[in-house]
Swiss-Prot record:
GO cellular component terms, semicolon-separated: extracellular region; pilus
SUPFAM superfamilies assigned to the protein according to its UniProt record, in alphabetical order: Bacterial adhesins
Pfam families in the cross-refs: Fimbrial
Gene name as annotated: prsF
Keyword DNA damage belongs to the record: no
Record-linked Gene3D superfamilies: Fimbrial-type adhesion domain
Keyword Secreted: yes
Protein name: Minor fimbrial protein PrsF
Amino acid sequence: MIRLSLFISLLLTSVAVLADVQINIRGNVYIPPCTINNGQNIVVDFGNINPEHVDNSRGEVTKNISISCPYKSGSLWIKVTGNTMGVGQNNVLATNITHFGIALYQGKGMSTPLTLGNGSGNGYRVTAGLDTARSTFTFTSVPFRNGSGILNGGDFRTTASMSMIYN
């Protein structure tokens, strides 16, 4: 009988020491970036440019690039990062030639600057140049002269990185 009482007492005591524990659940809702131009580099070739024609409004090259976005909810954002020319226009990439850069615009034409930089982290909202039916984005590149500085002849180059994401 003493053993039975002791067993029941131990059983009741062990029930009394049970306590609630917290369950922590964590994760990350990951929005995958878009694949741009099938993962291939984008080449913008201006060929030969007459320095007298570099007036920030002529000689544009328009590119249509494919975009494949596995997640399409919200607005499309674009981030283009590279060396800016620092001329008060935040859409001009610097080149290796003094006073010469390449201005970028969303869409065809020069009405919507393609702002360079991180913006809000995802870049800047796409407001022109998006064709969702064809899954393409169009941008325009324009030779840019900073002020009235003399442009020396020679090969020029610049690079930038582009990413796009819906958010």
